[in-house]
Each structure stands twice: as structure tokens, then as C-alpha cells.
Design a protein with these regions (language model features):
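A C-terminal cap/extension of S-adenosyl-L-methionine-dependent methyltransferases
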Residues: 142-171
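Class I SAM-dependent methyltransferase SAM/SAH-binding core
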Residues: 4-51
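A short acidic, Gly/Pro-enriched loop at the edge of an enzyme's catalytic core
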Residues: 49-61
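A short SAM/SAH-binding and catalytic strip from SAM-dependent methyltransferases
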Residues: 59-74
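A short glycine-rich, Lys/Arg-flanked "PGG" loop and its adjoining helix->strand segment in the class I
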Residues: 74-89
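Short alpha-helix
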Residues: 117-140
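Conserved class I S-adenosyl-L-methionine
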Residues: 89-117
């Protein structure tokens, strides 16, 4: 899903904020790619609320589940606005509280375990935040319709839900 979103973005500089253990920019054709995180195997270790990146310098900025686990997601979005070039692209990946994952989170017995300890952000709220920063939404995609099962067998049995999701459960 993320591979499709970053594959055709043109530019020279791409940055992934957070989750440095995973290379979500692997499908990007942009020549310079960097992972930034406060800890872990990141090429650049930095606080995401205060990026050591020049203003208007990034063509593609990827935020995989960063906002849900931030103390101040508004500040991170302000940094996104600052470092993105004009006509740059930000790909924001979030858990939807109005999904099967959100329902699972609401009834979770272990609330301090990842990803259930995050603050899932509803799409209308995210749209409001982006509008306040005058960031234009040019596209969007929902995904991960399969319920959050622990057993791979159940995940495979429910794989059909991915194809049906956008058609029958639009948000």
C-alpha cells in the first residue's frame, strides 16, 4: 500500500519520519532517502517535533504512524509544512478509530501495548489539521481492512476483506 503511494513521486530528497526499523521508502525512485527517528537504526537521530532539516528542502515526506504516537502531533505537522518543498508530497499513514482496528483498540485489555497505546486519529480531524496549515490533500487511500488477528491463519482467511473494503466500507 505505501509502496504504491511513494513509487511515482518525483524529486531528489525523500525522508521517512519514525519507524526506522522498516524501509517504507524502498519503492521510491527518489535518489536520496533518509530515515529520521529519535532512536533506533535511523540515519539521522532527531526529535520529530524539531527536525534538523532545511526549510523547503524535501520532496517526499513519509509519516508511518507517527502522529498517533506523538505527544504533540500538531507540532510535527508544522515541521512537515516547514521542510516540504512547494509542490512536495507528504504521505501520512494513520490508524483509523472508525475501523475494525479502532474497535479492537476500544476493547483492548492491554492498553499499553503497541499499537493499541496510540491515539488513533479520525480522518475528519486530520483533514482539519492539514487545512489549518494550508496543506492540500491531493489523494487518499484506506487499507488494512483485515481484522487485527494474531494468527496468520485467520489473517489469510480474511484476506478477501482487503478487496471488498474500499467498495463496501468507505469512510
Amino acid at each position: 500500500c505505501v509502496d504504491e503511494m511513494v513509487a511515482d513521486v518525483f524529486g531528489f530528497n525523500a525522508v521517512q519520519l519514525g519507524l526506522p526499523e522498516h524501509d517504507f521508502l524502498r519503492a521510491s525512485r527518489i535518489p536520496f532517502k533518509c530515515r529520521v527517528a529519535p532512536a533506533g537504526p535511523a540515519a539521522l537521530r532527531a526529535r520529530l517535533r524539531d527536525l534538523p532539516i532545511a526549510s523547503n528542502s524535501i520532496d517526499l515526506l513519509l509519516l508511518p504512524h507517527v502522529l498517533e504516537f506523538s505527544v504533540n502531533p500538531h507540532q510535527i505537522l508544522r515541521e512537515v509544512q516547514r521542510v516540504l518543498m512547494p509542490e512536495g508530497h507528504a504521505v501520512i499513514v494513520c490508524f483509523n478509530p472508525r475501523s475494525l482496528w479502532g474497535v479492537r483498540r476500544a476493547f483492548n485489555r492491554v492498553p499499553d501495548a503497541y499499537p493499541w497505546d496510540g491515539h488513533f486519529i479520525a480522518l475528519p480531524r486530520l483533514k482539519d489539521w492539514l487545512a489549518l496549515l494550508e496543506l492540500e490533500i491531493t489523494g487518499g487511500r484506506m487499507g488494512c481492512y483485515v481484522p487485527p488477528f494474531a494468527q496468520n491463519t485467520w489473517i489469510q482467511r480474511c484476506r478477501f476483506m482487503e478487496a471488498a473494503g474500499d467498495r463496501w466500507w468507505p469512510i
